[in-house]
Amino acid sequence: MAVSSAHSVNSGALAPSAVVGVIGAGAMGAGIAQVAAAAGHTVLLYDLNEAACDKALAGIRAQFARLAERGRLEPAQADAAGSRLRAVRALADFAGAALIVEAAAERLDVKREIFATLERHVDDACLLATNTSSISITSIAAGLRAPQRVAGLHFFNPAPLMALVEVVSGLATAPEVAQVLVATAAAWGKQPVMAKSTPGFIVNRVARPYYAEALRVLNEQGGAPASIDAVMREAGGFRMGPFELMDLIGHDVNFAVTESVFRAYFNDPRYTPSLIQQELVNAGFLGRKSGRGFYSYADGATPPAPDLEAPRDAPADVALFAQDGPAAALHTRFTERIAGARQAGTHADDLLATAGRASIALTDGRTATARAAQTGVADLVLVDLARDYTQAGLVALTRALQCSDAAYADAVGLFQQAGFRVVGVADVPGMVAMRTVAMLANEAADTVNQGVCSPADLDLAMEKGVNYPCGPLAWADAIGIGRVFRVLSNLAASYGEDRYRVSPRIAALHAAGRTFRS
């Protein structure tokens, strides 16, 4: 299709002289309008509620003034950006726009009606974008005279601060339209990624296991929310644990997204919603906004602490076994901090260490109880994954049912001697961080395998869209594809559920001895 002459020949981005329209004056629409105005565009903002539209414009101008006060903008720049904002009272007023971004209600019928109306008023070269986070771009564009000019332009909230933009192509979207939107998002200071229209796009799909596995562990009495959150923050390196994050998002919103993805994938068990979260929604315990979710947010409420193990004596005899992959850093930390520890080569049962009566290994997706029975190592204690064992201040341990109290105390004492605080969790397959990261990598691998996006764009999306400490594919490479394959295979064997089936991409890389980056 012909793309507006308002875009730059060199970059493909819309020139600052191009007029940008935004439909919807809520938080997201106002944020997108602010981003476009800051980039030099005249921005037309429309909302059915005229008072809300005027209030949003005043709020954006006030935000520009605050940025000037903080030295982030020159006063003249702030005034100029504010002057480029205008309210319009009808969709027909977008006639001269080069790009219109719709950020209205998340309803297919509403979006279709908006775009059908716009087609009657705008130039044939005007690009039509939707900020939807969940509705098929193909479905939104269906029935339009020119569906090839419709694409997703999905910002993350708050739009002025969050770097990521997902540029989403439906079946009819013209490649040059997506390229112009990618270039324009980059010109606006964002980091765009390209995706094809599938349920959840990239971020809302790949992030599902972060919530789902935590809820599964909680449902199996694996640990309290505060303990699971602490493991994911302090060992996993995530900014927020899954339960505090769900409380922040709102359980009504988070549960609805999970349900939507579950239905969209024809009830694939990977995306099965949690009964625990459904009960919170039924009770009205929606998180921060209602004052109660997994945690209480009442005045004076104190956040619960993780269930830390009490201090134990350091074990008398410690032997360390050589490691590769993520456990190599743990071996280094033990070597540096455990005086008198013996270097004992490698171990046939893949042990990390023996400490007093305890035998210690990194979880491989089996329960400690099953692994102890299979290897004949009764006093077995497993340690969970950490993003970087040299820096982590906390780790999770679990024990086999066969493990004696004395042996477990020796293991706890070893980790405490090495400077870790220790959270004890129940013996669930894959523990907490390892199963979560493996399932994130598995979902990411399937997303790439199905042609939704490139590996590089996927990792960038998860780092910039939801602040993951590392993209899940790069993380899988660091852990080792073979280890991730074993963890997933053992989870599948433990549960006997299709939910934990190994992605064909991971299986192929494992068979070939390859990585996502090789």
Positions of the model-derived regions?
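NAD(P)-dependent Rossmann-like dehydrogenase/reductase catalytic/cofactor-binding core
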Residues: A2-H7, A15, H41, K190-S197, ...
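Rossmann-like NAD(P)-binding element
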Residues: L48, A52, R66-L128, I135, ...
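Phosphate-coordination loops involved in phosphoryl transfer and adenosine-cofactor binding
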Residues: P16-V19, A97, A125, P315
